[in-house]
Amino acid sequence: MILSRKWANDYVDLTDIDNKTFCDEMTLSGSKVEGYEVEGSDIENVVVGQVLSMEKHPDSDHLWVCQVSVGDDQPLQIVTGAQNLKPMDIVPVALVGATVINRKDHKLEKIKKGKLRGVASAGMLCSFDELGLTQNDFPYACADGIFVLGDDCDKTLGMDIHTAIG
């Protein structure tokens, strides 16, 4: 059986217990622990952001040009094809240089500054798949869109996403 630490934390406070100690204590209680893995541990430079505004892309009927705050003075312009967003949503933002998981081949990839149909994009808004997470830990999250952070997450803009989602 695979046990989510996030799920277990709903029943027992694991805040100050590292993974190895948790596994050792589970084994001492009579439960067999074969190992543990930290989902999304290869993900880097992804932070909490807020969608400030969304405009239709001038050259596409399915893309949006978003202004996104990550706590800095100037918002980032990010182009997305996600259809589940609205202004003021709090979302994971992969900054230029970030490492995320490619949804197609499940390999790590670096985010680069680029253009989508002629409009500059300085990052990427992330789904939970791209963060190496599953819907088991976030059942409220949209399976086919950007991961909009819920009330169980810290929503401090600019915070590392691993810290924010616990």
Protein language model features and the residues they cover:
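Phosphate-backbone binding interfaces of nucleic-acid-interacting proteins
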Residues: 1-166
